[in-house]
Amino acid sequence: PYSSLNPRMTVEDIIGEPLDVHKLYTSKGERRDKILHLMELVGLNAEHATRYAHEFSGGQRQRIGIARALATNPKFIICDEAVSALDVSIQAQVINMFEELQDKLGIAYLFIAHDLLVVHHISDRIAVMYLGRVVEIADADELNASPIHPYTQSLLSAVPYPDPKMAKERQRIILEGDVPSPLHMPTGCAFRTRCKYATEQCAKECPTLTDRGNGHQVACWNK
């Protein structure tokens, strides 16, 4: 949120820029009405319209960016690390806002993040990637309860849980070895250099996603 907004533009001009580019209004009055409506959707007050980006907190700046993204009435939005730079309390507010906007506007999200608690909270289905390849796809609850791919298992084992009993029951999986360079990918499965289940087949051929039931897909030869 700190580098995505032009410091020389007011909030009104930032949110209104997509309207200008795509000519989505017929008068200045209609333009302003649309901007104020977008601001209201993301929880910004009308008096914020004439202020500049540096006058806002990180969470408010993110709301400005989201309002701008909504200006063209999209049906699909890609959210790339949309809350990673925010404090935890602000993250929760922004995520709740995403869900409210989805209910109101029927928007679909592709939510890219490294925080699995956030991902599980907001997602219907989750795809886990390793070095640019999808290694597992499942419904959010299914993936959280029954991960199959060794990489997914290691990721979930590192997630902190507030329940001490649950945290004690979940065994921490420590991966060994170094992450391969994306410029010099290993043959076969990219994860094999860190996987305790790796075999000769893993070095020869990259596994494809196979359905394990209920839409749960995994790319692994040995799991």
Question: What annotation goes with each model-predicted range?
Answer:
Residues 52-56, 60:
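Conserved ABC ATPase signature
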Residues 71-75:
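A short, proline-enriched helix->beta-strand linker immediately N-terminal to the Walker B motif
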Residues 33, 50-52, 170:
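Interfacial catalytic loop of ABC nucleotide-binding domains
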Residues 82, 86, 90-168:
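P-loop NTP-binding/switch modules centered on Walker-like glycine-rich loops
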Residues 139-223:
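Charged, flexible cofactor/metal-binding loops and thiol motifs
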Residues 7-21:
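Q-loop/switch helix immediately C-terminal to the Walker
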